[in-house]
Regions:
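Generic beta-strand/beta-sheet core signal
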Residues: 1-6, 11-13, 78-80, 182-183, ...
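Acidic, Ser/Thr-rich peripheral helices and adjacent loops at domain boundaries
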Residues: 22-34, 95-104, 223-245, 303-320
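Thiamine diphosphate
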Residues: 60-66, 70-76, 86-95, 157-222, ...
């Protein structure tokens, strides 16, 4: 640069580091917390997904942030290949502080289903062990409420692990887990759809979240089965010549599947309700989440991605609903 000075000069940031650490360690937000799920209350909870490397204004990350705020430590995520696996697991940074693992496009649904079966096997072993002690009040409390998060959390603290070393190795499974299969529309509508269909056909309590950008985002912008009629993208400039696959309607062909279509930019409370309903529903569930993307070419810029998402539902382009078979 001019005068021999560098255009970018690195300086010490120790003073700000101390201030930042103070804010993290002296977090008093929890006292404002409430079991009532609203946008305000949920914002006071410390998320288990922070500082990702996603694009500025990414429409996917708010869904994941709120997912971790709702389910906290009992959340387990199986993530498909795509944008969410890149900003979710790029070395050396890792934005999650809950169990998270990534698999391929074509087998992530089966991968997540396998994790759920592994968790259930561990919990069945705990159940079998506790049944051998019918007079133990703590064990009886767990056996009668083994799917109740709050009560199981109490039991977790009350168990004498010195007397029962067998449970010490499996204590992480005493509290029930909320299992989520997460991926984009490339995974859910296209490459991994066969796995999605297989999981939805079962009766297990498993949840699927589709981060629907309506385009192959991570690979630079190609049309997917989620792209709408006439939609253009960087590598599909001629426009799509057929219609968007109606994944929600297909899922509802199974009468036992919980289905929701959400747009956090339009109504965050509706999304939060869908999360709780899906997790508490005793069966498979799928939530399709409209996610504005840098590949959409929003003229006002990605800082307006959420207001753009609001308009998508306001004009009827993306419909939101919750369908609960129960």
């Amino acid at each position: 640069g001019k005068m021999g000075k560098k255009a970018l000069e690195m300086v010490s940031n120790k003073r700000h580091d101390k201030e930042f650490d103070y804010l993290l360690k002296n977090n008093i937000n929890d006292k404002y917390d409430s079991n009532i799920l609203t946008s305000r209350n949920i914002s006071f909870r410390t998320p288990k997904f922070e500082y990702s490397g996603a694009c500025a204004g990414c429409g996917e990350t708010p869904y994941l942030t709120n997912l971790t705020r709702v389910f906290n430590d009992n959340l387990v995520i199986a993530n498909a290949t795509g944008c969410s696996s890149i900003y979710g697991g790029s070395t050396p940074s890792f934005p999650y502080s809950i169990p998270w693992a990534s698999s391929l496009f074509e087998d992530n649904a089966e991968y997540g289903y396998g994790i759920l079966n592994g968790i259930n096997m561990k919990r069945d072993k705990i159940k079998k062990y506790m049944k051998e002690y019918p007079r133990n009040k703590v064990f009886k409390k767990w056996l009668n409420n083994m799917n109740n998060y709050d009560i199981c959390k109490e039991v977790y603290k009350e168990i004498d692990y010195k007397k029962h070393p067998y449970l010490n190795d499996m204590k992480d499974y005493i509290v029930p887990k909320s299992m989520w299969i997460v991926g984009g529309d490339g995974f859910a509508y296209d490459i991994g759809y066969d796995g999605i269909d297989h999981v939805l056909s079962k009766n297990d309590n498993i949840n699927i979240m589709v981060l629907d950008t309506e385009v192959y985002s991570n690979t630079g912008g190609q049309a997917s089965k989620s792209s709408n009629y006439g939609a253009t993208a960087s590598f599909a400039s001629s426009g799509k010549n057929n219609y968007k696959k109606d994944l929600a309607r297909i899922a509802m062909c199974y009468p036992h599947v919980y289905v929701a279509s959400c747009n956090i930019g339009y109504n965050n409370e509706q999304y939060l309700k869908a999360l709780k309903e899906a997790s508490s529903y005793d069966g498979p569930s799928i939530i399709i989440c409209y996610s504005p993307c840098i590949e959409h070419g929003i003229k006002s810029g990605m800082e307006h991605s959420q207001s753009n998402a609001y308009l998508a539902t306001e004009c009827g382009y993306f419909i939101t609903f919750r369908y609960n078979p129960s």
